[in-house]
Swiss-Prot record:
InterPro entries: PurM-like_C_dom (IPR010918), PurM-like_C_sf (IPR036676), PurM-like_N (IPR016188), PurM-like_N_sf (IPR036921), PurM_cligase (IPR004733). Its main location: cytoplasm. Belongs to the AIR synthase family. Gene3D superfamilies: PurM-like C-terminal domain (3.90.650.10), PurM-like, N-terminal domain (3.30.1330.10). This is Phosphoribosylformylglycinamidine cyclo-ligase. The lineage of its organism: Bacteria, Pseudomonadati, Pseudomonadota, Alphaproteobacteria, Rhodobacterales. GO terms for biological process: 'de novo' IMP biosynthetic process; adenine biosynthetic process. The gene is purM. GO terms for molecular function: ATP binding; phosphoribosylamine-glycine ligase activity; phosphoribosylformylglycinamidine cyclo-ligase activity. It comes from Cereibacter sphaeroides (strain ATCC 17029 / ATH 2.4.9) (Rhodobacter sphaeroides). It is an enzyme of class 6 (ligase). Keywords: ATP-binding, Cytoplasm, Ligase, Nucleotide-binding, Purine biosynthesis. Coiled coil: none annotated. Pathway: Purine metabolism; IMP biosynthesis via de novo pathway; 5-amino-1-(5-phospho-D-ribosyl)imidazole from N(2)-formyl-N(1)-(5-phospho-D-ribosyl)glycinamide: step 2/2. One of its GO terms (cellular component) is cytosol.
Length: 348
């Protein structure tokens, strides 16, 4: 009898179930290190459980956020420097949650690629776990999608999903009034927005990712991959102290577009651009691209990653609290009657 012809397997089609299982086992210790009160289940189930009562909540309202890291991924892929891109992913989600007054509780990630490389994926997800641990947020689940034919070799995509909570009635923004003070918390670079523009500027400059960064520090690639700062613990400490009326995460749209999102109708903001020094990376981007200052202000964080809107009579106290938490705090302006954001002084 002729030998029976061997049939196709899922691996023949480009999907390696064994690699997926190996990845789960490899990242379990990292996920376990993010456990916090309320964590019920580990990785591997059909769903993940979280106990709000065990987390200390009595009448909670849930808040959800989802985000990615945009084309910053392209730099991580091209340089092979993927260890911190997961921190960016977490930061983009949990920094948004805290702007609602919520404490981040748990996080799920989505990792998609054409061919699963376990070592690469583990480095990325271990970065996600690091970001979760730093923000008090449990990594309780995720999805790894191996999709042959959908991505070029070596490429991958990331998305994150965070859920937080606050007690009913504690949501932000709340009570924003004319005369409130704007406290700016420093960024450490571009964070995770505007990277399509950044990559275009790098192309115009003729520099490679391994060239020395023109604005100082490490190689250009590593300097631009500095992970987005996590503002969760320090921002929540300020909120719990009282007097904080709003928080604005300065992401895509820059100062010009993000601050008005937390201001009620009829109120705007005046910002003094001379209150802080524009970080060198933004000056280099602006000068290389002949970028006008208004365009810079509505594209990048310009050195201010989070704005705390606080009652004027509590501003000094909250600024001192944030400084004690390790923040670089600058009084950058105030809430005024009107609409939108107006600027005094110059950055460039």
């Amino acid at each position: 009898m002729a030998e029976q012809q061997k049939g196709l397997t899922y691996a023949d089609a480009g999907v390696d179930i064994d690699a997926g299982n190996a990845l789960v086992e490899r990242i379990k210790p990292a996920a376990k290190r993010t456990a916090r009160p309320g964590t019920v289940s580990g990785l591997g189930g059909f769903g993940a459980l979280f106990d709000l009562k065990a987390a200390g909540y009595h009448d909670p309202v849930l808040v959800a956020a989802t985000d990615g890291v945009g084309t910053k991924l392209r730099i991580a892929i091209d340089t092979g420097e993927v260890d911190t891109i997961g921190i960016d992913l977490v930061a983009m989600c949990v920094n948004d949650l805290v702007c609602q007054g919520a404490e981040p509780l748990f996080f799920l990630d989505y990792f998609a690629t054409g061919k699963l490389e376990v070592a690469q994926a583990a480095r990325i997800i271990e970065g996600i776990a690091e970001g979760c641990a730093a923000s008090g947020c449990a990594l309780i689940g995720g999805e790894t999608a191996e999709m042959p034919g959908m991505y070029h070799k070596g490429d991958f995509d990331l998305a994150g999903f965070a859920v937080g909570a606050m007690e009913r009635g504690a949501d932000l923004p709340q009570g924003v009034a004319e005369g409130d003070v704007l406290l700016g918390l420093g960024s450490n670079g571009v964070h995770s927005n505007g990277y399509s523009f950044v990559r275009k500027v790098v192309e115009l400059s003729g520099l490679g990712w391994d060239a020395p960064a023109p604005f100082g520090g490490d190689s250009l690639g590593r300097a631009l991959l500095a992970p987005t700062r996590l503002y969760v613990k320090q921002a929540l400490a300020a909120v719990r102290a009282g007097g904080v009326h709003a928080l604005a995460h300065i992401t895509g749209g820059g100062l010009t577009e993000n601050l008005p999102r937390v201001l009620p109708e009829g109120l705007g903001a005046r910002i003094d651009l001379s209150a802080w020094e524009l970080p060198p990376v933004f000056r280099w981007l602006a000068e290389t691209a002949s970028m006008a200052e208004p365009e810079l202000l509505k594209t990048f964080n310009c050195g201010i990653g989070m704005i705390v809107v606080v009652a004027a009579d509590r501003a000094d106290e909250i600024a001192a609290l944030l400084a004690a938490e390790g923040e670089t705090v600058t009084r950058i302006g105030e809430v005024i009657a009107g609409e939108g954001v107006s600027y005094d002084g110059r950055l460039l």
